């Protein structure tokens, strides 16, 4: 599982529509559907319930949504923290 899978899942979960999510993510709908199918296979459960062209999150999907958002937030924070340290080192003035 890669961070992109989490981003794809979150977008679909927020849109509750594969077509709109694929347009928002700039990825072909069949490819996005396959990515989610692969993710569900890896997790061993369905994340979405698909009935009569309606898409809803399963109980597992609801929990995964919360966890995936948390993981992406932590990832963004980690990147920010490293860049802050790196930028501070670049701007450090050494005298003597």
Positions of predicted regions on the chain:
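A short LG(V/I)-centered, amphipathic sequence patch enriched
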Residues: 40-60
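Base-recognition residues in the alpha-helical recognition helix of bacterial helix-turn-helix
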Residues: 7-10, 34, 49
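Alpha-helical linker/hinge and terminal dimerization helices associated
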Residues: 42-43, 64-86
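Short helix-boundary/capping micro-motifs
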Residues: 10-31
């Amino acid at each position: 599982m890669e961070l992109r899978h989490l981003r794809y899942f979150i977008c679909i979960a927020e849109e509750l529509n594969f077509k709109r999510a694929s347009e928002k993510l700039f990825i072909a709908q069949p490819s996005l559907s396959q990515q989610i199918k692969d993710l569900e296979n890896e997790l061993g459960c369905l994340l979405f319930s698909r009935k009569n062209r309606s898409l809803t999150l399963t109980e597992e999907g609801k929990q995964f949504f919360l966890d995936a958002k948390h993981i992406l937030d932590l990832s963004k924070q980690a990147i920010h923290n490293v860049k802050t340290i790196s930028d501070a080192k670049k701007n450090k003035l050494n005298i003597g």
